[in-house]
Amino acid sequence: KNQISRDLNSQVKETSGGQNPYAVVLSCIDSRVPVELAFDQGIGDVFSARVAGNIVNEDVLGSIEYACGVAGSKAILVLGHTKCGAVTAACQGVELGNITALLSKVKPAIADVENMFPE
């Protein structure tokens, strides 16, 4: 197994007085896609906004605006991944509590792809 070669305690101490992330990454909540590990970044290097299916609502957009407009991040990256459970659930028409509203925001993208690639 690979091990993290960073001194996390030191990074926590170094960033305790403030942060200056150069980028904000919007990614899915999928546990297999840890942003900092995927890009070999340490604590304080990037803002990470995570939401199932990479859905942007006012709160997520406000977080991204904070990262860039207030904290000075210069880059925005949207990180997708394969076999996304939220996309699969939207394709299957899953309805369950609050996830129903979230999945409804994925459906227009699914319709666009289906129109581009009819079976």
Task: Enumerate the language-model features and the residues they cover.
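Divalent-metal-activated hydrolytic enzyme cores
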Residues: 1-20, 43-44, 53-74, 85-119
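Glycine/small-residue-rich phosphate/adenosyl-binding loop
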Residues: 20-24, 28
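Catalytic core of membrane glycerolipid acyltransferases/transacylases, capturing the structured
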Residues: 32-49
